[in-house]
Each structure stands twice: as C-alpha cells, then as structure tokens.
Amino acid sequence: MSVWNYVVTAHKPTSVTHSCVGNFTGPNQLNLIVAKCTRIEIHLLTPQGLQPMIDVPIYGRIATLELFRPHNETQDFLFIATERYKFCVLQWDGEKSELLTRAMGDVSDRIGRPTDNGQIGIIDPDCRLIGLHLYDGLFKVIPFDNKGQLKEAFNIRLEELQVLDIKFLYGCVKPTIVVLYQDNKDARHVKTYEVALKDKDFVEGPWSQNNLDNGAGLLIPVPAPLGGVIIIGEETIVYCNANSTFRAIPIKQSIIRAYGRVDPDGSRYLLGDNAGILHLLVLTHERERVTGLKIEYLGETSIASSISYLDNGVVYVGSRFGDSQLVKLNLQADPNGSYVEVLERYVNLGPIVDFCVVDLDRQGQGQVVTCSGAFKDGSLRVVRNGIGINEQASVELQGIKGLWSLKSSFNDPYDMYLVVSFISETRFLAMNMEDELEETEIEGFDAQTQTLFCQNAINDLLIQVTANSVRLVSCTSRELVDQWNAPEGFSVNVASANASQVLLATGGGHLVYLEIKDSKLVEVKHIQLEHEISCVDLNPIGENPQYSSLAAVGMWTDISVRILSLPDLELIRKENLGGEIVPRSVLLCTLEGVSYLLCALGDGHLFSFLLNASTGELTDRKKVSLGTQPISLRTFSSKGTTHVFASSDRPTVIYSSNKKLLYSNVNLKEVNHMCPFNTAAIPDSLAIAKEGELSIGTIDDIQKLHIRTIPLNEQARRICHQEQSRTLAFCSFKHNQTSIEESETHFVRLLDHQTFEFLSIYQLDQYEHGCSIISCSFSDDNNVYYCVGTAYVLPEENEPSKGRILVFAVEDGRLQLIVEKETKGAVYSLNAFNGKLLAAINQKIQLYKWMLREDGSHELQSECGHHGHILALYTQTRGDFIVVGDLMKSISLLVYKHEESAIEELARDYNANWMSAVEMLDDEIYIGAENNYNIFTVRKNSDAATDEERGRLEVVGEYHLGEFVNRLRHGSLVMRLPDSEMGQIPTVIFGTINGVIGIIASLPHEQYVFLEKLQSTLVKFIKGVGNLSHEQWRSFHNDKKTSEARNFLDGDLIESFLDLSRNKMEEVAKGMGVPVEELSKRVEELTRLH
C-alpha cells in the first residue's frame, strides 16, 4: 500500500523571487540576500566575487524580503513576510554564524479578502513602521518603538480597493505612503497618505496625480534630497513630487517589473522589462530639483524578477523565467552594442512545466528532461544524479592490482607515467608525442613484481615500494639510486609515501618509517604493534606539502585506526571502530581548509573524523555506507579543488561544500582502482581500473545533480521520450513581438535523445496550441507513434471548441503525419490505453481505437466516452482504471468495461480541489497536487459495505508542499540497486514552478512509523528560521480549511539530521532510543532515494 509517503527535495528551488543588498553580516560586509520562494541565501561580496555564506529553508512562501536598519544599529536587519501571513525579523549572529530571530508574529485577519495583486510589504525609510497591504481595503501598520522593537499591529482602512503598488516616500516629517491604484473605470492614479500613528489613521497626503498611463504598475520612491516618486508605465515613465514637479518621457512599449537603485542618492536606476532588456533610467537634477528623465539601453539579460546593484558596476539579476546572472556593466559597448557582460550564470530549472524520465544507459537510473523557463529564456534541461566520467581512451587489461601516476620531474605540472601493478609484475605506460599511451620502461624499477606504492619524491627521485624493497630511482637517468630491503623472512604488506617520507608495514605488526635524506633512504624508526597492520597513510595535511607530522594506521584484530606522530611513531590517538570488518584504506586529507581522517572498511562502510592537524585529535565521528565491497581511497584534483575518490562496487566522490562532507555517486558500475592522471593532453583526467579494463577519462563538475541546458529561445510545454526511435518530441511556442499585435507560433519538435540535436519540426496551424504528447503503439500494429493533442485558442472564445489529435511516425529522423482527427475541444491529456488512445477533451473522456482502412491507411475511430467533468485536465491509467484530475472537482476514478465497451465512474473525491497534476501510486492509492500548493492522496474503497462508500475516494494523506506541482511521474533519479532495501521502494518524481525536482517515496509501514517519530523529535531540535512553525507550514491549507499533515513525512527535515553536530545527533538518538550510528545509517539510506 502506498499510503505512507516520504517527500524529499532532489533539486532545491532555483527561481529567484526577491533579492536585496545591504550590510547584514557585519557593518563593513556587503551582502546579497536572495529569496527563492521557500529558501533564502546569504552571499558575501568579496574581491573574488560572491561567496555563499548560508542557504536555509523558510517555513513559508516568501512574499516580502526587505533589509532595514533600526536606530542605533551598525548593521541591517532582515524583514520577511510569508504568503500565509507570518512575519519575522532576523539578525545575523557573527560569533555563531547563524540567524537570530528578533521578532516574529502573525498578521492575518479573520475577515478580509486577500488582495488579487499579491501582498505588499514595505518599511518606512526612517524606521518608524512596517506597512503591509494583505487584504483589499486594509493597510496594516506595525510600528517601531524608539528602541527599534516592534509594537502591536493595527489596521487602517484604505478606500482604494484595486491597489497596484504602495511605497513609503523618503524625507517626510511624518511617515507617508504613495498608493498606485485603479478605479472602477480602469483608470490609474496615485495618491499620498500620511500615517498618523497616534490616531491609527490616514491623513490625506500632500499630493496626488490622476490619469496615469493605463499600464502604470510600479512605483520607485526617490531618496532625499530629491524625494518624490517615479511611476513606471508601459508607454511612459513619470516623475512627480510634493512640489508639483512633473516630468515624463515616452518609452518603447514594455512591461517593467524589476528595478535596482544604482546610487544612494537615487539619480540612476536599472530597469528590467519582460523581454529581458536592461535599461538605465537617469534623473537629471540641479540644486536638489529633478529637471528631466533620460533612459538608455544597456543590453540583454535573463528576464529579471529582481535587480540588485552590488558595487563597481556589478549587478545581480534574479530571474524566475531563466538563469539568474551576475553581470558587469561596461563603459564601452561590445560589437553588438551591449554594455552588459555576463560574469556568472546561476542555473534555474523553473518554471518546470513538464518533464519526462529517460533511462539512456539502461542502468535503471533516470535522467529527467524538463521543459524549463519561459518566453525567450525557455530551455530543455537534462538533469541526472551523480558524477559522470567522460571516457577519452580505454584498453583491455585483466587483473589490475593498483594504479599510480608519476611526473617526469618533481616540479613538472603534468603527469608523464602511469604505473600499473599486477599480481606478479608491474607495467609502465607513458604519453608519447602523439598523446597516446604506450608501454615504456623505468630501468631502476623492479618490473618483475607487484608494486605496492609509487610516488614522486624530492631531488627529482621516484619511489617504488614492493613486497621486498623500497627503491629510489632518478627521474632523469631512470637508474636505481638507493634501495632499502625488507628484513630476512619478512615482506612488506602495505605502504604509503609522500615526497620525503615512506611508511611501510611488514608481517608481525612491524611498522617501519624511512626518510629521504641526500637522495638516500634512511630508516628513522621501527616499532612493533600488537596486531597486524591493514593499511597506512601519511598524506601531508599540515603547512608543509612535502612532509607529514602525522601518520594514520589501520589495524586487524582490534579493528582500530591509530594516529601516530612522526618521526617517533608515538601513539597520539586510538579509535576503535567496532564490529568485525577490517579497515582497508585510510586517508589523511584537507578539503576546503578542513582536515579529515577517512577510514574505509572491507564491507563498503566509511568512517569520517574531523582531524586537528597540529594535535592529531579526532572528533565528530560519522559513519556512512557507500557500497558492499572493500573501498580504496585516493585524493584527486578538479578545477583546482581537492576531492576524494572512493573506489568500490559503488564508486563515490567525497567532496566538501560549505565545510560539510557530501557524497556523490559516480556513474560507473564498479571501480577497483583510481588514480589522478593529469596530462598536458587531457588535464585533470583520471585513470580508472574496472574489471578487465583500464580507461582514462575526465570528470564532470563535482556536484550531486548535473544539469545540461539546451537553450530553445522559446517555451517548451509538453515533452515525451520514444526509446524505439531514440528521440524526444516536445510541443513548444514562440512569442512573435514583431507586429503591434502579439502572436504565438506553436510547433512540435523532434530531438535526438543522446546528442539533443534538432531533427525535425512540424508547425501547428494559426491559433493552434500543443496541449499534450505521448508515445504509444496500437493493437495489431507494430509501429510506435507520437500522438499530439491540440486546441484552437481563438481570441473570441472562453474555452476552445475545437482541437486535433495528430499521429506522427518517426521515419528517417523526421516527423511524418500519419493520421489527424478533429475534436470538439482542447485535448488536454492523452494516454495509451490497452492498445487504444484515451483522450481528455474539455469536459469529456473519449476513447479512440486504431482502425485499418481498406486502402491500407489508418484512422482513429471514437469508441466510447464519459461526461461529467468541469474540465478534465489530467488523466492517468492502470489496467482498465482511469484517474482524472479536474480543473475544480478534484480526483475521480473511472473504469472501462470491455463487454459493454463503455467508460463508467466508479468513485470520486467530493472535495473541491483545483488540480494541477495526478498520478496513480498503485492500484488503490492515487496522488494529486492542487493550486494551493498542497498534495494529497486518496484511496479506492472497493471493500466498503455500501454503494455510497464505494463511490467515494477517501482522502488518506494530506501535506502542504509549498510548491505548485505541474507534473507527477513514476521514476527514479538514482540507480535502483536490487540488493539494497531502498531499491524496493517505489518513487514518483515531481516538478514545480520554482524549479524544484522532488521525490515522493512510498514506505513500508514500520519504517514510516519510525521516521514519523524521528520527525517529531527533530522538530524540537531544529527550529525554523524566524521561529516559524514546521507543523503549521506543513498543514494542508486552502480557502476552506487547514488540517494537520498526515501520512506524509518531510524528508528535507529528516535528512537535515545529518547536518547536526555530533552532540545534537546523540541527543536526538537518545530521544529515539536508538544508537546514533544506526540512526545515521537509516537516514543515510534515505538520501539514496535521490
């Protein structure tokens, strides 16, 4: 049963809704604060660019984000208000590097009609009050006292009902607002009011301005001494103030919704319009009076939702419809006449209108191909989990036991040799002049035995460790310079070396430490430990990159890892790992300036410890499971940053982000050995030994999800994959802004599913929109077809009265129209249904069968249908059952009866939900998403006693996701390994307007109960930012009701357990009555779902 569901984010929201700039984390630190609907990010502006400081979830959808500075404060505070009428004031705690809540509260009113044009939240420039316009006809005031604390809020009646914008004016003795509104004749005006705090009322303000541009939609208040306000229309920009100064300029018709102030005195503003054009508006002024306005074209950016001017001509452009950008404004134009230079792009998947899941490598791992972005910023995005290795060369080699790369001299930036070790020999490969790998010889090395370790050393030497000796060989002559032999009767089992030190272990627990001095190997220390040694490492992590003062040693028998000091091999710390599995690989490493000891076991588990590089102390012990086979650890470098590669049956890259260790799976089946091989021909590449093969490849950017962009310059709205023809097809449309009239042209486009090359295009008729697309086959026909459902959207019709179903075959990479069928409405949804085609057309569900005509051609013939919907927008099928998501009437269940060849309604959910997506989790449980950002599940009551109960779909789960879901589809972003318990858990992927990709996993009941307990324990330990309540945030909420979340768990909260400090983890584990190791392991397993 899929009643118990776990909801988790695989890709966080990326649509930028707000941004602001100020001194938040320190008086002299300039911060960019970005809101992405339900998250905020704080960045620090440094000479090197923007540096991320913190990225936190907010338990609400952010409606207002404003910085302000109360009296007597040296840095800014942050005011946030949410769509569900909660607010908070945040302050930065520099010592703890975290957000403090200064104030919070609820500003909802029992009565009142929520505003149509969205909430407005503004702060008086002199910090006397916060103003909120949340309900028609009301202006809510939260006053500050003279210490900067918030006092009780009150409402003032506002006679303007259709408010478009409100701002506070600068430089007013009494707090003054300016209101842009529309009257009942659709004319637009501005009016000013003073806020009388004592009387809790408005006083008619100093001025007003009537009959503005019909498209006036944005107010920009100008700082003192100029003062006044700029009113941005669609065809004019106007400046006016209390001294009845009135200045206006015409502009080319556009809709401007985003602005950013450049100078503190407010004489220049950046304006972004709906076509992504950036303009500079200049107020010319003399003696503190505005004399005129000038507007200049700067260039093109993404379509801006927010513009924040940072410093030195650098601007952050936040976008909801495309990638956000960091741009530089240049004084000179480039050859295309643009002053805008893009410094950095921040990927945004929003709005995800549709997606399909494609398993290209047939590994049971889905890639998600999304229809993302809007208007000119529309694109397809290919999203996959894990890090890809792009193979450049490979050769068949059996039985590889180890790999090392060597340089031709110590200071050479590039690697020259690849040392490949086998059970009874060692072979040497080198790059030749044609950049090909060929076999070579290093005369001083012993090629007749297995190599245990190899390394470049100081004085241009090479080190080779074998079972019976350590050899020093000259880089230049390649001859043997010095040799240390293992004592009679002993052989070396494991070894490690760096540029000046060698550490090796022989049988009987002997540990020998050598140093290279004057091109000689000197035995410095020899000790015997009480057990056999299983692995050693002395990778330098201190100041000196050529010398380590610490060594790590893994032990048999007592299953421990020890930190020893060098050169005297004194024990500093012994850490018992517990269990019976021997450590197989230890590694000392520094990632993002933090030192770690990593210790990998023979069963695929990995321990990580924070390591104090000067004292050798170990803290913050954590254990994760990476695979089931022994792991070997190696560092490598990519784009100048160090990471760790863990070779095993599930190869993993361990990397650090925001000083936290993250694990990303590598998209390879099994890796036995890896070493970095940084050659001039293929920089930053890796040599990888798999079963029977050695390959050289480059590695993707190190991150958990990889996103590839296919820019379209138009908007894709429906997409589908067809494995047989190796193609993707999608419906898209382009805005034509050439004429006075805006028009759209709609297409069906075909792409190669591997290269994403455009293969073919089919243009739809004028006014015809593509609404749905599927790949399917029909009874008694072996071909596979793309079926496209369309609608004719005519300007004079409220609802389309005609559409078409188009059936295409892919022939030689081209779309061939085989059949078309006219319909009496929009074809909102199509499904393959038992060898037939099921269509949702306006209010009706219609079934078509595929008929062969006498002339050998085909046609779609109507078989039966079912009425009874307002608009049937979404359909899913399973066997003979059909689930319908309606515009307003929630979810209903239909069944196709073969004998009568009819479709009948079995049951429905009688709640009024405006649906945005549906999916069948299994035969009994169906999931839906609706337009108040909730998701819910319903159950078919086939065993109920009465007809009435059987006819009702029972709501069994409810949850506030806080995201508008456009599509739910079965699939997985990760490899499903049949041996792991997570491999058996069914998952559904969802995509949202804010660019979130999420996973809904249906859990077994006992696991759900355990995690539910963990969630309620964690709520006590992890407080919401601004003290916002998690329980309230996740409660199902619409206009009619609010009810507690049930049968859904918040995976993001549960997985944040892994970010807690060790002490907090232990407290949570104590509350759960479960050992901390087991709790970590269970939560780690869940992260494998995405």
From Swiss-Prot:
It is found in: Nucleus. It holds the Pfam family Beta-prop_RSE1_2nd. One of its GO terms (molecular function) is damaged DNA binding. Keywords: DNA damage, DNA repair, DNA-binding, Nucleus, Ubl conjugation pathway. One of its GO terms (cellular component) is nucleus. GO terms for biological process: DNA repair. The keyword Repeat does not apply. Expressed in proliferating tissues. Highly expressed in shoot apical meristem (SAM). Expressed in roots, young leaves, flag leaves, and panicles. Not detected in mature leaves. The keyword Lipid metabolism does not apply. Its main location: nucleus. Belongs to the DDB1 family. PANTHER family: DNA REPAIR/RNA PROCESSING CPSF FAMILY. Component of the UV-DDB complex, which is composed of DDB1 and DDB2. Required for DNA repair. Binds to DDB2 to form the UV-damaged DNA-binding protein complex (the UV-DDB complex). The UV-DDB complex may recognize UV-induced DNA damage and recruit proteins of the nucleotide excision repair pathway (the NER pathway) to initiate DNA repair. May function as the substrate recognition module for a DCX (DDB1-CUL4-X-box) E3 ubiquitin-protein ligase complex. This is DNA damage-binding protein 1.
